[in-house]
């Protein structure tokens, strides 16, 4: 998905945003994820409970937070209203957000905010 030539978020090839050359311009790529994604409720070998989703997100966050002590990290979580919006699933997201907000030096934001930050600081 590309937003008005500002950034694209249809890449899975890295953990942090990066620039590519597009013609004579630079195109910002903001990576997306398939593993920290509620779409796994709808696929084989995916999540079959909110608790599994929560545990996977928590384990991913814990690993990245530890790694982030030496360099910045980004954790993308893919969410779709028709999937995460179910009562048994939304609780796992609320529980995860409650967990991570207890940590210092984290930023919970939208992809567009990441793009704006990257454009401002790393153009």
Regions found by a protein language model. Give the residues of each.
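C-terminal domain-boundary segment and adjacent tail
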Residues: 58-123
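Active-site-adjacent pocket scaffolds in enzyme catalytic domains
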Residues: 4-71
């Amino acid at each position: 998905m590309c937003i008005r030539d500002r950034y694209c978020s249809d890449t899975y090839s890295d953990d942090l945003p990066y620039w590519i050359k597009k013609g004579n311009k630079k195109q910002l790529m903001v990576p997306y994820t398939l593993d920290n994604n509620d779409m796994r409720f709808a696929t084989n070998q995916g999540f079959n409970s909110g608790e599994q989703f929560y545990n996977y997100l928590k384990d991913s966050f814990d690993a990245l937070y530890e790694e982030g002590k030496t360099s910045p990290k980004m954790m993308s979580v893919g969410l779709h209203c028709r999937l995460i919006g179910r009562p048994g699933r939304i609780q796992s997201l609320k529980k995860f957000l409650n967990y991570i907000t207890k940590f210092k030096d984290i930023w919970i934001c939208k992809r567009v905010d990441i793009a704006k930050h990257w454009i401002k600081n790393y153009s």
